């Protein structure tokens, strides 16, 4: 049986070819639109349910519902082994040694409790002689907690008279002792109390309203308004001079990281209570040896505030892609590869691989760059610059060439990533010429994270002065943490000693209280020490 054939003239053939081409083009557009809609749905799911961490182990695993449960439930492991000196836990196929008891309690005092025999038990049951202690053996360790104790200290000024002068002249020479300076006149506030309030709010994220309830349970009627006054007055009077000195030290650094976040201030002139203000943060990197984390409150997000703060600074400024930083003159702008990687991550569909997703290619390029930076991290600035030009520069050349081959759908997350990369190319490449610069803005982002977490608890500031005071205290405690200090101990020391310097202390006096000085480290990092039973 022969094949049936249909005769088609040339015009009909061209029309069919054109129709097939149009259908293929329409199909491609619809597939692109479908991919875009799936991308929007995936990002909505991520925003609502997903893991916010950017650690690479959470990415490219195909899941979207990460971190759905509360921390206690998500982290609970009924088979978890209590840490000991020799314990090594093996989750799945990886081995990671857990911290030992000694490491977990390294900064705690130790009380030794000897379980001894009573007088009756000291009598030997065989011969009637007396047992003598010949040794001791550690059987167990337990972590104990002593609730805080409050008491009132009354300071009395003592007067002394010279009886010899009185005998000779009839008038006694009288001297009177000087009591320690007060934080505030006619107030119960002490350095320890105010430091405790500040630490609980700005380090532990405990709002003053909750602190008020804690004081009530301890039998003390201390209102949140009183605590607020303590924080504001002590920050403005005693901590602000050191805060300003920290700014001067920061501007002398060669690299500054900058970022900002929202803060709501209820009673701000000319603005509605629901309007947004800004908390700016500036930080140097750890290569300086003197870590500084500086917060500054401003009524809005205008780049003029960054320009004013950084006036006179001529080093490298590491930021995200916010255009407001373009107003800062005289600096070398450096971009953030963490932001770049985040754009690729957000553009990756579920289950993305390099074979199925162009965004996964961009994400992989970024991961390779970060892997190189990890290898370079211990190098000096000069050697790191050379290493980057040898190993990182070829990687970036390939990255930028690959980027030019992309033609993403308008409005897609992939298009956002490509646009960000092209707009930031100059800034993203700047680190190649500056070995002292890190490739991400993580120093500023990590510094501002405690503020963002605390904001979830206390929600807003009442007044601009309160917001400014919060900026001062956050600067002090975050800089203390960056320098390895205990924030409470450092605050207590500052509030004890700074009043002796008066309200306008000299710069050289303030330098003695910077958190990286040897004396401050000695007093504000708690050493491990042994305490005998007789001492407690």
Task: Describe the residue ranges of each PLM region.
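Short, flexible loop/hinge motifs at secondary-structure junctions
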Residues: 1-185, 257-258, 319, 398, ...
């Amino acid at each position: 049986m022969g094949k049936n054939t249909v005769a088609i003239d040339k015009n009909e053939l061209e029309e069919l070819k054109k129709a097939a081409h149009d259908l293929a083009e329409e199909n491609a557009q619809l597939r692109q639109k479908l991919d875009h809609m799936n991308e929007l749905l995936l990002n909505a799911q991520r925003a609502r349910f997903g893991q916010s961490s950017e650690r690479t182990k959470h990415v490219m695993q195909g899941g979207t519902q990460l971190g759905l449960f509360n921390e206690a439930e998500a982290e609970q492991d009924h088979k978890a082994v209590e840490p000991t000196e020799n314990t090594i836990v093996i989750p799945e196929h990886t081995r990671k040694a857990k911290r030992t008891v000694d490491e977990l309690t390294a900064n705690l005092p130790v009380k030794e409790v000897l379980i001894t025999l009573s007088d009756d038990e000291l009598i030997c049951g065989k011969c009637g002689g007396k047992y003598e202690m010949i040794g001791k053996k550690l059987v167990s360790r337990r972590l104990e907690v002593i609730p805080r104790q409050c008491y009132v200290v009354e300071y009395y000024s003592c007067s002394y008279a010279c009886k010899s002068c009185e005998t000779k002249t009839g008038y006694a020479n009288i001297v009177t002792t000087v009591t320690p300076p007060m934080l505030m006149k006619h107030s119960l506030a002490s350095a320890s109390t105010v430091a405790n309030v500040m630490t609980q709010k700005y380090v532990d994220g405990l709002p003053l309203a909750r602190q008020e309830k804690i004081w009530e349970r301890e039998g003390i009627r201390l209102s949140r308004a009183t605590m607020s006054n303590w924080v504001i007055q002590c920050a403005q009077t005693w901590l602000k001079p050191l805060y300003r000195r920290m700014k001067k030290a920061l501007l002398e650094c060669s690299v500054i990281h900058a970022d900002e976040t929202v803060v709501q201030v209820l009673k701000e002139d000319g603005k509605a209570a629901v309007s947004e203000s800004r908390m700016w943060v500036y930080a140097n990197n750890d290569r300086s040896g003197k870590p500084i984390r500086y917060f500054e409150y401003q009524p809005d997000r205008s780049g003029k505030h960054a320009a004013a703060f950084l006036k006179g600074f001529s080093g490298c400024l590491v930021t995200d892609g916010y255009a407001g930083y373009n107003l800062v003159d005289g600096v070398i702008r450096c971009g953030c590869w963490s932001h770049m990687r985040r754009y690729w991550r957000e553009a990756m569909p579920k289950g993305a691989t390099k074979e199925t997703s162009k965004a996964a290619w961009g994400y992989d390029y970024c991961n390779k760059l970060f892997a190189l930076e990890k290898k370079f991290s211990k190098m000096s600035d000069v050697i790191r610059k050379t290493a980057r030009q040898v190993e990182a520069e070829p990687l970036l050349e390939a990255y930028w060439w690959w980027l030019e081959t992309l033609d993403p759908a308008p409005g897609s997350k992939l298009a956002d990533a490509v646009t960000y990369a092209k707009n930031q190319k100059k800034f993203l490449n700047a680190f190649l010429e500056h070995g002292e610069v890190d490739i991400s803005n993580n120093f500023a982002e990590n510094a501002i994270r405690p503020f963002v977490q605390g904001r979830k608890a206390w929600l807003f500031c009442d007044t601009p002065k309160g917001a400014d005071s919060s900026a001062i205290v956050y600067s002090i405690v975050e800089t203390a943490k960056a320098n390895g200090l205990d924030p409470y101990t450092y605050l207590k020391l500052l509030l004890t000693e700074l009043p002796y310097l008066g309200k306008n202390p000299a710069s050289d006096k303030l330098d003695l209280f910077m958190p990286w000085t040897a004396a401050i480290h000695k007093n504000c990092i708690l050493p491990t020490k042994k305490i005998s039973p007789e001492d407690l």
